[in-house]
């Protein structure tokens, strides 16, 4: 039986959405409403081979969702909003409470609100999106899908920071990890493509984009991940530094009089590829600058690959070996150069890349003689969200869909 499921990602001034026909995972439409709250909000809707774009005043998220539902019926994608049988919402932070996606109830919403102190930029707007859909589609079941939930299988040695214990007990300061929905999707899809149970695999998943994180997956469970208490930590990213010596921060505060807010701005918005290259946060722009002879751009690319390679190495040691390395995200899926740089000099591990396969973005890019599979898999967090709606709200197990 077919079910129409919506996957929603609400931002502070945007609303991304997909409508999927489940359990087949067929994409019926997708779109984005951006610049919410402004007179020139951008509205994009794609369905099959058709695309509609316009600008219009969109006062708030309620108006955005109303517009979205009107577009679905107005363009004939569905006959009535009654056809929507479930809604899945991406939520940034589930803390230690949510070890899986959860049906939206008053209790669920109260806990998401309580956890907003751990994700003050994201949980409140995620909550806003959920509440608007509850008001406009009160009889449609909803599921909250948490970026952090997949990493709740980490053991204490992986998630505890070596700080005084009371900071964990009182404030919940620990490694949480993010991009969990993406890491879960690509590892499951990898196992499908290999025809091997995920429980039998040791995988390192590399979600590389403007925000990047790595995840060690053993037996289908996350055993380590590079992002920590916040999405700022781990490997170098587009504008985020990743891990640095923490004493740099009080030193800068004393030397330049920087406030905590200014230091946070520096680490999150002025560092990474942008900070080192001085060119851009976009990997493609930095590549072009490096090819034009910019030494700082070349250094930024080297640093990016080195930090990722070092993390991969530590995860291989932790898992006692590696069966597959997976690349996903905007950079991971599209930059053959980044993949080649990251896999450089790893032949001693049985990991090497075939240049021709890599250049054409083949699904498997390892050399014929390589012991370790190297895969390029387009992530599909929306499909993962829709699957969780089916599993939790509609009590059905979705069939596997290819990436």
Curated annotation (Swiss-Prot):
Q: What class of enzyme is it?
A: transferase
Instruction: Write out the function statement from the record.
Output: Works with phosphate acetyltransferase (pta) to capture exogenous propionate and regenerate propionyl-CoA during degradation of 1,2-propanediol (1,2-PD).
Q: Which SUPFAM superfamilies match?
A: Actin-like ATPase domain
Q: Which PANTHER family match?
A: ACETATE KINASE (PTHR21060), ACETATE KINASE-RELATED (PTHR21060:SF15)
| GO biological processes | acetate metabolic process; propanediol catabolic process; propionate catabolic process
Name listed for the protein in its UniProt record: Propionate kinase
Q: Part of which pathway? A: Polyol metabolism; 1,2-propanediol degradation
| Catalysed reactions, as listed in the record | propanoate + ATP = propanoyl phosphate + ADP
Q: What GO molecular function terms would the record report?
A: acetate kinase activity; ATP binding; propionate kinase activity
Species name = Citrobacter rodentium (strain ICC168) (Citrobacter freundii biotype 4280)
Q: Which InterPro entries match?
A: Ac/propionate_kinase (IPR004372), Aliphatic_acid_kin_short-chain (IPR000890), Aliphatic_acid_kinase_CS (IPR023865), ATPase_NBD (IPR043129), Propionate_kinase_PduW (IPR024896)
NCBIfam families registered for this protein in UniProt: ackA, PRK12397.1
Q: Which UniProt key words apply to this protein?
A: ATP-binding, Cytoplasm, Kinase, Nucleotide-binding, Transferase
Its localization reads: Cytoplasm
Q: Which family does it belong to?
A: Belongs to the acetokinase family. PduW subfamily.
Gene Ontology cellular component terms for the protein in this record: cytoplasm
Query: What Enzyme Commission number(s) apply to this enzyme?
Result: 2.7.2.15
* Highest rank taxon of the organism: Bacteria
The record lists the lineage as: Bacteria, Pseudomonadati, Pseudomonadota, Gammaproteobacteria, Enterobacterales
- HAMAP family in the record: Acetate_kinase, Propion_kin_subfam2
């Amino acid at each position: 039986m077919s079910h129409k499921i919506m996957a929603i990602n609400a931002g502070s001034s945007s609303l991304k959405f997909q409508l999927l026909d489940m359990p087949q995972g067929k994409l019926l439409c997708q779109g984005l409403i951006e610049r919410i709250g402004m007179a020139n909000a951008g509205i994009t809707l794609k369905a099959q081979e058709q695309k509609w774009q316009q600008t219009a005043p969109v006062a708030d998220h309620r108006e955005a969702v109303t517009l979205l539902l009107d577009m679905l019926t107005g363009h004939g994608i569905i006959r009535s909003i009654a056809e929507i049988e479930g809604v899945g919402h991406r939520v940034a932070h589930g803390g230690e409470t949510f070890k899986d996606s959860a049906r939206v109830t008053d209790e669920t919403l109260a806990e998401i609100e309580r956890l907003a102190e751990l994700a003050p930029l994201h949980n409140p707007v995620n909550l806003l999106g959920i509440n608007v859909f509850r008001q406009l589609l009160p009889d449609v079941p909803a599921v909250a899908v948490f970026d952090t939930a997949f990493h709740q299988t980490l053991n204490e040695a992986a998630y505890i920071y070596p700080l005084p214990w009371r900071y964990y007990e009182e404030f919940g300061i620990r490694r949480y990890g993010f991009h969990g929905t993406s890491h879960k999707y690509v590892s499951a899809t990898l196992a499908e493509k290999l025809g091997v149970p995920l429980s039998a695999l040791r995988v390192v998943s590399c979600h590389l984009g403007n925000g990047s994180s790595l995840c060690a997956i053993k037996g289908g469970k996350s055993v380590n991940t590079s992002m920590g208490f916040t999405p700022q930590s781990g490997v170098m990213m587009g504008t985020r530094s990743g891990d640095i010596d923490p004493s740099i921060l009080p030193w800068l505060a004393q030397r330049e009089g920087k406030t905590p807010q200014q230091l946070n701005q520096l680490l999150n918005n002025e560092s990474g590829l942008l900070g080192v290259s001085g060119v851009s946060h976009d990997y493609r722009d930095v590549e072009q600058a490096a090819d034009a002879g910019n030494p700082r751009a070349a250094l930024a690319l080297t640093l990016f690959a080195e930090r990722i390679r070092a993390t991969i190495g530590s995860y291989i040691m932790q898992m006692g070996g590696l069966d597959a390395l997976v690349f996903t995200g905007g950079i991971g899926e599209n930059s053959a150069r980044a993949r080649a740089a990251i896999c450089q000099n790893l032949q001693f591990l049985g990991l090497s890349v075939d240049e021709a396969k890599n250049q054409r973005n083949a699904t498997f890019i390892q050399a014929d003689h390589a012991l370790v599979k190297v895969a390029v898999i387009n992530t599909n967090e929306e499909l993962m969200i829709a699957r969780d709606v089916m599993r939790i709200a509609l009590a059905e197990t979705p069939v596997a869909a290819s990436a």
